[in-house]
Amino acid sequence: LDKLTYAGNLSTLVPVIDKQNFRFVKMDICDRKAVYHLFEEEHPDVVVNFAAESHVDRSIENPQIFLETNIIGTSVLMDACREYGIQRYHQVSTDEVYGDLPLDRPDLFFTESTQLHASSPYSSSKAGADLLVGAYYRTYGLPVTISRCSNNYGPYQFPEKLIPLMMMNALEDKPLPVYGDGKNVRDWLYVEDHCKAIDLIIHKGMVGETYNIGGHNEMANIDIVKLILKELGKPESLITYVQDRKGHDRRYAIDPAKIHSELGWLPETKF
């Protein structure tokens, strides 16, 4: 189910839309009555919550919708799971709940025991949702798992995100806006590797546990932009440095040792 907001794209479902075991429902996860009705119809065994407002800049402009979707929506889904009974509820989260790491300490990585220290309204809403999921596990015994991933990239990504935005602007010879000095570091994870990790957690992960999912692909934003320009044969003169984002996290880096050692997962796609 999906609300199909500005970033929704039904064409991504074309390969599966005619499958007998697939059904798409347009719905807002904050609509408790509609969600309960769907659960009563379908009686799902597993619920995976990918639904989220996820763009940091938009969360700075309007935090309210992030709190509604990311926290209230999560509570509605879990209440429905409690009401109708499920085998597993999985919460898809983000490494941004941990805050950031200093650039001069490449030896530091986020682990599952790293304290939550969110920097933006977006990451704060995701951290709040994670805490709520943990509370439903402890209070109600809801069979939950949580995954926290690094920055995703891949087919169909909405062009407000760094990689598709830079590619589209470069192809059209438009300026490529880079925040601050461009040295902010992100760990990149291919979307299919992410999905395989989630599938593994659902089937083999321990109830009540959190798993970090990282790609082992750390790179500064400016280096990614320059790489894109090189691959497309475009000049670096298209790069335009702009005022830095408020509260911009400096570095993200995930240690995925837990999911590797316990479940055998490793990213297959090199950045």
Residue ranges and their predicted role:
Residues L1-N152, E192, W265:
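N-terminal Rossmann-like NAD(P)+-binding domain of SDR-like oxidoreductases, especially those catalyzing
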Residues G8, K33, Q157, M219-D223, ...:
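Residues that form or flank phosphate/diphosphate-binding pockets in enzymes
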Residues L10, S75, L101, S125, ...:
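Gly/Ser/Thr-rich beta-alpha loop segments that engage phosphate groups in nucleotides
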Residues L10-L13, L101-D104, Q157-E160, I224-V225, ...:
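Short aromatic-enriched loop/helix-cap "lid" or pocket-rim segments at secondary-structure transitions
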Residues M27, P164, A170-F271:
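C-terminal substrate-binding subdomain of Rossmann-fold SDR/epimerase-dehydratase oxidoreductases
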Residues E68-I71, Y122, K126, Y156, ...:
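Short, solvent-exposed loop/helix junctions and linker helices
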Residues K126, R148-N151, Y156, R186, ...:
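Short, cationic motifs built from Arg/Lys/His that form the positively charged side of catalytic pockets
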Residues G128, L132, Y136, M166, ...:
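Hydrophobic alpha-helix immediately C-terminal to the catalytic Tyr-X-X-X-Lys motif of short-chain
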